[in-house]
Amino acid sequence: MIILLVGSGGREHAIARAIKNSPLTSKLFITPGNPGMQKLGECKNIPVDDIEGLCNLAKLIEANLVIIGPEVPLVKGLKNKLNNIGIKAFGPTAEAAMLLSLIHI
């Protein structure tokens, strides 16, 4: 399975490590990633708010699954757009992410 992981933080680093260790993973791409994540997958320098760039990368690498960590691409509709072009994505829709971003604890 070819997986694209969006993000560069500690949570995404932990997810990348788990994906890398899965026997189901044939290739892991990470964007934008960080220096420590380069050991786990191939990092591509696409900002998390570049929705078109992320969709184009997912098509180019023929991703079977995109895992979206940060809130910004979720609120901007990355999952919605990926689903519209036939690419499976893990994360809430833009509407659900927007609702979650409005909740203050």
What are these regions (language model features)?
Residues 66, 103-105:
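Conserved small/polar residues in nucleotide/adenosyl-binding loops
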